[in-house]
């Protein structure tokens, strides 16, 4: 082995099987493709996922206390850009836009993706700050699978788990790389391509405006007020300001750490 830079750590840990984290609050259902997740305990059965405060799903899970994990088959790979590249904040009903349907879990009523190969209903039990993300710990209350799961194991003759290998690097268009172990079929899908591109660009601009507002503010309260005004100007929910400010503060701390480690 040879030593490489820490900036490559995330890519070293791929490929992984991502989950779609779904949640609902006040009638708004959202979801995001998440690669950073794991089982954390047998008894009680606890699952964990890392989510950044800026993500709309973060707000839904925080405020509802109920969420779900959904595992997808590779046949749904074309739905991934809606789930991983664009925010529910900017594309309301993005799961429906992806051509997917929502059903309700039998125990918690959590929103589940009807086309998923497996789903787990989770009750939020704790949130642990971990740098620029928070780790959400959820106790599993119910699990559902298609018939490809039998005898206590997935049948890979019929189930092709969606796996994620990471993003290609700039310059040039960025692609997310997905694959499945059956035949190692591979797909490269442009990041936020086509009609999703303007929404991804809008998200980048919004994050930039929020970061500038936070830098220009002398207190957190002042920053939240400034971001509320920005959200109102953009036709977005001003109540998201707290989460966006928290994310900007975490990013700033992360930038400082990187600067210190490289100096």
From Swiss-Prot:
SUPFAM superfamilies in alphabetical order: FMN-binding split barrel
SMART domains: Flavin_Reduct
Keywords linked to the UniProt accession: Flavoprotein, FMN
Coiled coil: none
A GO MF label: FMN binding
Cofactor dependence: FMN
Domain of life from the UniProt record: Archaea
Pfam family, one: Flavin_Reduct
InterPro entries from the UniProt entry: Flavin_Rdtase-like_dom (IPR002563), Flavoredoxin-like (IPR053310), Split_barrel_FMN-bd (IPR012349)
Family according to the record: Belongs to the flavoredoxin family.
Protein name (database record): Uncharacterized protein APE_2580
The organism of origin for this protein: Aeropyrum pernix (strain ATCC 700893 / DSM 11879 / JCM 9820 / NBRC 100138 / K1)
